[in-house]
Amino acid sequence: MTASATRKLIDRYYAAFNAQDTDTMLDCLGTGFVHDVSQGERRKGKKRFAEFLAHMHKCYHEQLSDIAVMTSTDGARAAAEFKLEGRYLATDEGLPPAAGQTYRLTVGAFFEIEDGKITRVSTHYSLPDWTRQVIG
C-alpha cells in the first residue's frame, strides 16, 4: 500500500468517526484488528470494537478537528494527531457523573496497515486532563 493510499484510508476512518458511521469505520478495519487505548483495555476484533463504539456513542458525542496524518514511506504505518471536542452525555462506569460537560483534548494515534486495511490502532490521550475538565 502506498503512503497516499494509507493517508486516504486514515482520512476515511476519521471522517466516519465524525459522522458516527460505525459501518464505514468497521469497513476500514482488517482481519485480526486490535484497538489499544493508553488509558484502557486492549480490544481484539471488529465485534469488540463495534461494541466499544456503541458504548462511546451512548456516553459521549465527540468530533475531531485539525487532524494531521503522517505515514511511513511504504504505507505500512501511520500516525495522527488531532483535537477532540466532546460532550459527556451519560455516566461511564468508574468515571465522574455525566451532566453534559464539554471537554477538549489533544489526541495521538498510531496505525498499522495490511492489505489496505487498518490492523491496529493505538490511541493516546490524557485521562487526568479529561477528568479535570469534566469535574470543573
State where each predicted segment sits.
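C-terminal and inter-domain tail/linker signature
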Residues: 1-136
